């Protein structure tokens, strides 16, 4: 059967990673029938990842409350009365203790967040020590500390920080309805400083803040058209906090959330797409659909900064029911391994007279690339 190369659907499953997505193309993906969208997202997910492996992170608030920013969704903003108890920067020993417990519960990455506009010079030595000591536990490290200049990014990288989280939150058009104390360009500048320092980028957004679908399209377009896709893309569902301006916005349709996850997977096929804030509000069935749509990372544990998160034991039971398992970071594919998997998929499809595009009409033979448990390299099988 000839390849279908002219439609947005078939272009989405081209194995080449793109940075030139048009809004009309992303609109077309969102508009697909739900089953078709999930099928395409799942096909791309399987081409790049073990579909039953989920990267597990734990997030700890190392400095809580009194943030000078006015993000309308955030309980930590000093602009709103959310009755959140303020806390100073945690002691390094306490952070290491929490990281050790997270590792014992199956987390491979430990993320540390501070409610700052930007790190202060006097706090940096403690932050850098946290990174070093958590790394000594054999865990990956991630931080979110607000805006970074070049010097701060360089210091974090030198200490060994693996990932830096700095979300775009929403589309450029809707951004001013949510935040006024920090510009969109401020966020993009921090991301550039992080990337230039050699760290990996964790960057996503929040949905369900009263935005339109066009804003979700715009957010994903911004992420997918960055010079390098974020290695990790957290998709947050708004957690409504009493006292914040967004406490009473209408709920987002769960299927629209799943669609957002699926489109993120298609646009950024090599990135980890993380179910982040808001999982507490999702039932197991909605989470299962997200995993099917290409989500392959979660935050694990009872707290996500200052909001509830599903308990670790519940996550373990859900993983068992779905037949999925935490990803061992030692078996994560390198960039070269991802490229090898891409080339293998392309070659196989060419041999099947399907051009460079996945043929959604022929479901009898699908290439499945998984990671060999011993080598961490991709292998190709058929099913």
Curated annotation (Swiss-Prot):
Pathway(s) it belongs to: Cofactor biosynthesis; biotin biosynthesis; biotin from 7,8-diaminononanoate: step 2/2
Catalytic activity: (4R,5S)-dethiobiotin + (sulfur carrier)-SH + 2 reduced [2Fe-2S]-[ferredoxin] + 2 S-adenosyl-L-methionine = (sulfur carrier)-H + biotin + 2 5'-deoxyadenosine + 2 L-methionine + 2 oxidized [2Fe-2S]-[ferredoxin]
CDD domains in alphabetical order: Radical_SAM
Keywords, comma-separated and alphabetical: 2Fe-2S, 4Fe-4S, Biotin biosynthesis, Iron, Iron-sulfur, Metal-binding, S-adenosyl-L-methionine, Transferase
Details of cofactor binding: Binds 1 [4Fe-4S] cluster. The cluster is coordinated with 3 cysteines and an exchangeable S-adenosyl-L-methionine. Binds 1 [2Fe-2S] cluster. The cluster is coordinated with 3 cysteines and 1 arginine.
EC number: 2.8.1.6
Molecular-function GO term, any one: iron ion binding
Coiled coil spans: none
EC category: transferase
InterPro entries (alphabetical): Aldolase_TIM, BATS_dom, Biotin_synth/BioAB, Biotin_synthase, Elp3/MiaA/NifB-like_rSAM, rSAM
Location of the Radical SAM core domain: 52-276
GO biological process: biotin biosynthetic process
PROSITE patterns: RADICAL_SAM
Residues bound to [2Fe-2S] cluster: 111, 142, 202, 274
Taxonomy, superkingdom: Bacteria
Oligomeric form and interacting partners: Homodimer.
Similarity field: Belongs to the radical SAM superfamily. Biotin synthase family.
Protein name (record): Biotin synthase
Gene name tied to this protein: bioB
